[in-house]
Swiss-Prot record:
Annotated residues for binding of [4Fe-4S] cluster 1: C62, C65, C68, C117
Highest classification ranks of the organism: Bacteria, Pseudomonadati, Acidobacteriota, Terriglobia, Terriglobales
Family the entry assigns: Belongs to the complex I 23 kDa subunit family.
Catalysed conversion reaction: a quinone + NADH + 5 H(+)(in) = a quinol + NAD(+) + 4 H(+)(out)
Name under which the protein is recorded: NADH-quinone oxidoreductase subunit I 2
Residues binding [4Fe-4S] cluster 2, per UniProt: C72, C107, C110, C113
NCBIfam families hit by this protein: NuoI (TIGR01971), PRK05888.1-3 (NF004537)
Cofactors named for this entry: [4Fe-4S] cluster
Main location: membrane
Membrane topology type: Peripheral membrane protein
UniProtKB keywords: 4Fe-4S, Cell inner membrane, Cell membrane, Iron, Iron-sulfur, Membrane, Metal-binding, NAD, Quinone, Repeat, Translocase, Ubiquinone
Length: 175
């Protein structure tokens, strides 16, 4: 009698499995699905990759106060400060961040750096495509953070050196 109950339970489970096998999938094909460059919609509070801001005069807002680095629980922000001169004015304050790196190998996107910044120099953008084959590509420099554009956009850019992949990307762009 116990065997019949077990067989019935197995048949019920297999019935559910087989019914799910023939339903249409709801998975988007990455990287061809929604993304930053393909019109994805993000909530205002989305915490994506960081962006360093400039003021209305085009100067950097970062004054190298190190509060963002101090607030970071994962210690992924590295800053080196330098003094502004009259001939070389980078920010509106006495100092500026000569080096500003964020290591996305360590970043947990908590937002503490954004909250700690007194000048609103660092904000969260909408970038989320961080996939790469080399961990050193995930250390973003000041120039990459100021532009607001990631150094690489998804996996397609990584394979661009392969001539066949480059031809496929060119054909796709021409459509």
């Amino acid at each position: 009698m116990g065997y019949l109950r077990n067989i019935g339970a197995i048949a019920k489970g297999m019935g559910i499995t087989f019914s799910e096998m023939f339903k249409p999938t709801t998975v988007e094909n990455y990287p061809d699905g929604p993304g930053v460059l393909r019109g994805a919609v993000f909530q205002e509070r989305f915490r994506g990759m960081h962006v360093l801001q400039r003021d209305e005069n085009g100067l950097e807002k970062c004054v190298a106060c190190f509060l963002c680095a101090a607030a970071c629980p994962s210690n992924c922000i590295y800053i080196e400060a330098a003094e502004n001169t009259e001939t070389n004015r980078v920010s509106g304050a006495e100092r500026y961040a000569k080096v500003y790196n964020i290591d996305y190998n360590r970043c947990i996107f908590c937002g503490y750096c954004v909250e700690a910044c007194p000048t609103d120099a660092i904000t969260h953008g909408h970038g989320f495509e961080l996939a790469t084959f080399n961990a050193s590509n995930l250390v973003y420099r000041k120039e990459q953070l100021l532009s607001g554009k990631p150094a690489h956009i998804g996996a397609n850019e990584i394979f661009a050196s392969d001539s066949r992949e480059q031809q496929r990307l060119d054909q796709k762009a021409a459509k």
